[in-house]
Amino acid sequence: PPLSKLDKVINWELFREPIEKALYVEPKGAGGRPAFDKIMMFKILILQKYYNLSDEQTEFQINDRTSFKQFLNLKIGDKVPDEKTVWHFKEQLANKNVSQQLFNLFTEQLITQGIVAKEGSMIDASFVDVPRQRNSKDDNADIKKGAVPLDFAKKDKNGKMSKLFQKDTDARWMSKSGERHYGYKDHINADSKTKIITKYSVSSAAPHDSTEIENIVDETDNKLHADSAYRSKEIEEFLKELKCESFVHERGYRNNPLTDEQKESNNIKSKTRSRVEHIFGFMTNSMNDAL
């Protein structure tokens, strides 16, 4: 739904207590900059999920779009959280293991309000490109191993690991259809009727789309639409265990091409499944290409 409608049907104050409880720190006395409202920061994360935005793109779009400002109750001239502030808020929630809890609460409200009918689900994945980093050969070797380079962990004169804060050690390279991507993948489960995202997972850009299926599909899904990247014996068995009807596209192989019947079946399935591409298409065309 439009952001204005979403803003009306969601009781945002329900999120304040779990967020403030998770992020509470003992006050260190007067002084310092006032913190941004926690509900506004959470709404920024909802915008990121809705529009597949990186932290950098998020800051730009909030400054650029009137609809975003209205959704966040910001007036022209109000200070907007920068990309590092958005990243830090996300990291805090993730470290306290409350991100998924908050998103589930958000989805429950959409279902309660009748906006999401749960008549079927669509899954897909999309790249979220982030700025490419200039690291030394040794640093990149450590990052590929999943280790933090020693150079990143050095403390500055204030006792802080400022270089580590500025570096992204989780983003990865991936090539697809001749294009190189550096960053992450958003894996989403969206309601087939409204196209509202109800579950999500984030990985680096490197893993195959299907690797996150167990994190975005569960017993609440009764019908699943997906492209052939999600077609495998293991996934079909997984869906059967969940009692979820599979509408995953059939897959052809080099010596075993699709039959005419399978092609026709895929064409019928595409009428619903392609709606998930509309989500990513909208994200890409209306948001990222504006940068």
Would you name each region that the model predicts?
Residues Y50-E56, R134, S286-L291:
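Short helix-capping/linker segments at secondary-structure and domain boundaries
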Residues K69-Q70, I196-Y200, D289-L291:
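Short small-residue beta-strand/loop micro-motif enriched in glycine and branched aliphatics
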Residues E56, F60-N63, P81-E241:
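Polybasic low-complexity intrinsically disordered regions
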Residues M40-K43, D209, R275, I279:
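Catalytic-loop motifs flanking and including active-site residues across diverse enzymes
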Residues L3-I46, Y50:
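Basic, short loop/linker segments at the boundary and entry of helix-turn-helix/winged-helix-like folds
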